[in-house]
């Protein structure tokens, strides 16, 4: 390919809409063009990158016996309603684009394909003898992101690889899950990425277990917690840990104390010489579920800990057997709208009376009461007395016996001790999710009644796994991890071109002829090569080459008449003056090929 025919359009200035460096460089390098918020055109340079990533993915999955397919992007609402996900994906903060056809039938524009593939497999696979099977596709997905940002990191239209496996039993699922994890490790290694695999929350996809593959980057949206021995890692949404023992509050006669205007943990401790770990703080949440009901929730946790909203939402879903569409802390405005005026925020205890909800217009009339393990382990504690400016002291759970659920809803944090080894502590880093694998179990096969005949001749539900890779996101994540002040530094395996040849002076015949000879030789040997044949100053060509990040640069310059060229490595920044045989030998060694 010649630059004069590439439609290359580079920018010197940082685009105003780009917040992180990878987004800035993709725009400046002419890799993407923004159409509107969260929607981008993949320009020819990026399309070559995406095709190389896709090729690596397809090659690796084929070695695992996966079959490639292409599923419909338009999906009928009926199958999503049967799985119980239609409301959670289209209401509240749901991310599915939905529409109606001419007949008034509701359709969704596929953000994911669990329902579709489950229905198809149930109509196609009938016996355990046909299992296991693993099917994948690579296609455009659509998600109505509330806040699309960071370019391809969180866009409303993107390219994704999603695979779905079907099994006769759990052991077979776990075997394939392990194989797919290995395949993902191979894929991301071949793409030249530094990554970690961590435990993750399954979110709206669901299932018993899941893991995320994260590219480590300071700009990552996700906080990852990793043990100091690297034997445990998890997204903070999922992470578990052992907290340090707090300061003991010696048991004494339970009593009520006056605490005027001491609404916060800090105020309460500063005025009374308490320690946050001696306090049970209680927060009031409101959970909206897909049964259209709103459930008030009282959550108790040790005063020096924070609530993990993801864990809390999951526990409420399990308790109610409903999907939680939205969960948030109840505000004074919420109370006023419900006609409730006497809940003393800042002084709430775990035993706040359900009678206060009798006045509510649209909420359920009883609190769901949940206590984190950190609070339930306290033998003597301080908590609100449900009256303004009053707290209880030296109370225990025998005196306040109102909790329905005791579980882990605490947010693990850096410095906490590790579950697998108490001598190890959690450390934090930030990451960009590029892959996610799930053990779905029978979640979808049961809801969609997808069955097969097992070895005993009995109808049984499929065991399922699903496995996603964000192809377009991976491309930008690679840039986030591989760049410098001059521009992108693509890993060779996914670079749009492996080599760029620059003619320093297009009017110099020696330089043109030498560059053309090298160009034809590399094409003959199937090297992905770009020839900068523009009538531009050499400095502009060098800046563009650095910006777009081609791994190797050959410059036909002043020494061309002597048959010498400069060979420059974009990553190491090492430049050598070599004859052509030495150039071809060097590149052959780098590309592990016998040609050149």
Curated annotation (Swiss-Prot):
Q: Which domain of life is it from?
A: Bacteria
| Location(s) in or outside the cell | Cytoplasm
Which reaction does this enzyme catalyse, per its entry? tRNA(Pro) + L-proline + ATP = L-prolyl-tRNA(Pro) + AMP + diphosphate
Q: Nucleotide-binding: present as a keyword of the record?
A: yes
- Is the Electron transport keyword given for this protein? no
InterPro entries the UniProt entry points to: aa-tRNA-synt_IIb (IPR002314), aa-tRNA-synth_II (IPR006195), aa-tRNA-synth_II/BPL/LPL (IPR045864), Anticodon-bd (IPR004154), Anticodon-bd_dom_sf (IPR036621), Pro-tRNA-ligase_IIa (IPR002316), Pro-tRNA-synth_IIa_bac-type (IPR004500), Pro-tRNA-Synthase_IIa_type1 (IPR023717)
Q: What is its main location?
A: cytoplasm
Recorded GO molecular functions are: aminoacyl-tRNA deacylase activity; ATP binding; proline-tRNA ligase activity
Q: What class of enzyme is it?
A: ligase
The alphabetized list of GO BP terms reads: prolyl-tRNA aminoacylation
Q: Which UniProt keywords apply?
A: Aminoacyl-tRNA synthetase, ATP-binding, Cytoplasm, Ligase, Nucleotide-binding, Protein biosynthesis
Q: What is its EC number?
A: 6.1.1.15
Q: Which PANTHER family match?
A: MITOCHONDRIAL RIBOSOME PROTEIN L39/PROLYL-TRNA LIGASE FAMILY MEMBER, PROLINE--TRNA LIGASE
Family assignment from sequence similarity: Belongs to the class-II aminoacyl-tRNA synthetase family. ProS type 1 subfamily.
What this chain does, per the record? Catalyzes the attachment of proline to tRNA(Pro) in a two-step reaction: proline is first activated by ATP to form Pro-AMP and then transferred to the acceptor end of tRNA(Pro). As ProRS can inadvertently accommodate and process non-cognate amino acids such as alanine and cysteine, to avoid such errors it has two additional distinct editing activities against alanine. One activity is designated as 'pretransfer' editing and involves the tRNA(Pro)-independent hydrolysis of activated Ala-AMP.
Subunit and interaction comment: Homodimer.
Fill in the domain comment. Consists of three domains: the N-terminal catalytic domain, the editing domain and the C-terminal anticodon-binding domain.
Name listed for the protein in its UniProt record = Proline--tRNA ligase
The gene from which this protein is expressed is: proS
